[in-house]
Amino acid sequence: MTEIKKYSALNDLAEKGGTVIFGGKEDKDIPLCELRQAFELGSNYYNRSFENLSIENAAELYLSSVAPLAPETVLLHIGENDLDLFANNPDKFLELYRELVCKIKSESRDCYIAIVSLKNYDNDSLIAKLNERLKYLADSERCEFVDVSQKKVWNPRSTKDAISFICSLGFVRHLKSHEPVYDLARTLFCYA
């Protein structure tokens, strides 16, 4: 896979720590540098998204492309390519997702994990069920769940001001990252 080779070469240059987006085809084109500049996001941000990421190959790809970065935070946005699997065998999908979360925790005990829902702007019942199960999984595994399923009125300027204000007061989560994860994920996954 050329993506793995590309990410391996980038990982050799990257600083360890920071926040990693681990998602699918939709996430590969997130304009991370531009959003980082526009919202004055601190820390290091890396996008390790794969065109054909599935929950069935996620653990292997995580180990080869994300784990070497020793991330402080991982934003998991997985499921886009797994709708058929979820429709036919939701328990297997959730079992594989839980195994991925456990693998991340075993690789880095202090890594903060956020599970990001799938977008569901058309109110698809299958995606709604998948997101519901992802929320349950996040709760049971003590991960943060970020719901980006519905279009929301979003004012980028007020989000930027709110993030800046909260951080200036010192209200940050217990790790080193300086942005609240929910607002960070909304910024990264809902910019368009």
Located regions from the model:
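Charged, glycine-enriched surface loops/patches
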Residues: 91-116, 133-143
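Substrate-gating cap/lid alpha-helix
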Residues: 120-151, 159
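Short, amphipathic alpha-helical "lid/cap" segments that border enzyme active or binding sites
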Residues: 59, 90, 94, 98, ...
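Active-site segments of SGNH/GDSL-like serine hydrolases
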Residues: 77-81, 105-129
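A short acidic, often aromatic-flanked loop/helix-cap motif at beta-alpha or helix-coil junctions
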Residues: 53-56, 151-156
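Structural signal for conserved beta-strand scaffold positions within catalytic alpha/beta enzyme cores
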Residues: 46-49, 115, 147
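N-terminal secretory targeting modules
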Residues: 1-20, 27, 32-33, 37-41, ...
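Conserved SGNH/GDSL esterase-like catalytic core that processes O-acyl groups on lipids
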Residues: 2-95, 125
